[in-house]
Each structure stands twice: as C-alpha cells, then as structure tokens.
Regions:
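Ordered hydrophobic segments in well-structured contexts
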Residues: 22-25, 63-67, 149-155
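N-terminal membrane-targeting/pre-transmembrane regions
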Residues: 1, 69-71, 153, 157
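A general structural signal for short secondary-structure junctions and capping/turn motifs
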Residues: 22, 57-60, 141-142
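Hydrophobic alpha-helical transmembrane segments
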Residues: 1-3, 127
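Short, surface-exposed polybasic-and-hydrophobic patches located at secondary-structure transitions
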Residues: 59-81
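Generic secondary-structure microfeatures
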Residues: 34, 50-53, 70-74, 100, ...
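Conserved beta-hairpin
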Residues: 8-54
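Terminal and domain-flanking low-complexity segments
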Residues: 82-192
Length: 192
C-alpha cells in the first residue's frame, strides 16, 4: 500500500522535471516541443524570421519574441494538434495584445482582433473549425499587424531573440552548414 503511494508521487516528480519548451532544428525541419504537444515545420515551409515591431508614435517597439513567416499556412495547420493550438493561443495572448494596443490607440479595435473566430477558410479554400480555426485567425491577424505568422516568445529560447532569429535565418539559407557549425561549436576542443 505504501509503495503504491510513492509510485504516483515519483512519476509526478519525473513529469515535473520535463522541459516545458524545446526547439529542435534538423536539416529538414523545425520542431517546437511543448508540454502539451508539438508542431513541426519543414525547411521548405520556413520563409524567414525576425523581431516583430509595432509602431509606437514616431518609434518602433520590438516584441520580446521571434517572429516566423510561413510559406504555406495550410501545410503548417495540417501539422498542429488542437491541444497545442489552444495552449499557444492562451500563452501568447499577451504578446498579441501588445501589438493590438499599439494599433488601437483610439479604442476602435476590430472585434476580430480581440476574439478569434472559430471558422477560417484559407486562400486555397480549405475550411477549418474550432481551435485550429482560431489559431489560423490569430496567424492571419499577426501577419496583418507584424508581417509574421507565428511568435516564439523569448522565454522558450536558449539565447537572445536577435541571436535566435539570426540562427533561424542561417538555417533557412543552408541547413546542412548551419547544423554542422552548431555541432562543431559543441565539441570539447571548441569550448572555451
């Protein structure tokens, strides 16, 4: 009976030690692993990355995130599960609202920016419903407001947003060379 009590506690402890976020770059794809699921993007679907900026009077405010522009949204949406789409909608809402606030200084925000619709039809005519449609609408609004489809918050990265964006673009330009350079920098003789 006592050992039956310790096993669930031990399993709970092990689960709590799992990483909450992880990004994996291979020669063929970018994978975002989250405690609640994962999404992947083939190299061919990655357009570019950068730091999203929003106009703030005469200046620009950089979001504390890396923006990713996708080549084919339908290809991306087919790879994401509703569970992680819903979690990302919630977790990234504060970043999205920072963008919306800068575009709605007079208080006249379009209602679709504040609440994502549960229906979405892509440019290819593919219809989505539920959480995937809500996520697709968020992607559409992000692209309209920042030029990027996805956000990778600084909290999920292992380096600064500028370094990570540079790394993603280097990976886009030549994934084989980028992966080799990362492996070489991790070898013992190349460490400081």
């Amino acid at each position: 009976l006592i050992s039956g009590t310790f096993v669930p506690i031990f399993i709970g402890f092990l689960k709590s030690q799992e990483p909450y976020h992880s990004l994996i770059l291979s020669e063929s794809e970018l994978v975002y692993c989250h405690k609640y699921g994962a999404w992947s993007m083939p190299h061919s679907n990655f357009h570019h990355s950068g730091i999203p900026k929003v106009e703030d009077g005469f200046d620009y405010l950089e979001l504390n995130a890396v923006g990713v522009k996708v080549n084919d949204i339908d290809d991306f949406l087919s790879s994401i599960a509703p569970r992680i789409a819903g979690k990302l909608l919630i977790e990234q809402r504060n970043l999205f609202m920072q963008v919306v606030q800068k575009h709605c200084k007079n208080g006249n925000c379009p209602s679709e920016w504040l609440i994502e619709d549960t229906h979405y039809t892509s440019h290819k005519g593919i219809s989505y419903t539920g959480l995937i449609a809500m996520f697709a609408n968020r992607m559409r609004h992000l692209r309209q407001l920042t030029g990027y489809d996805l956000l990778l918050p600084a909290s999920v990265l292992d380096r600064s947003i500028w370094d990570f964006s540079h790394s993603l673009n280097a990976w886009r330009n030549n994934p084989v060379v980028f992966i080799e350079s990362q492996l070489e920098s991790k070898t013992p003789e190349n460490r400081p």
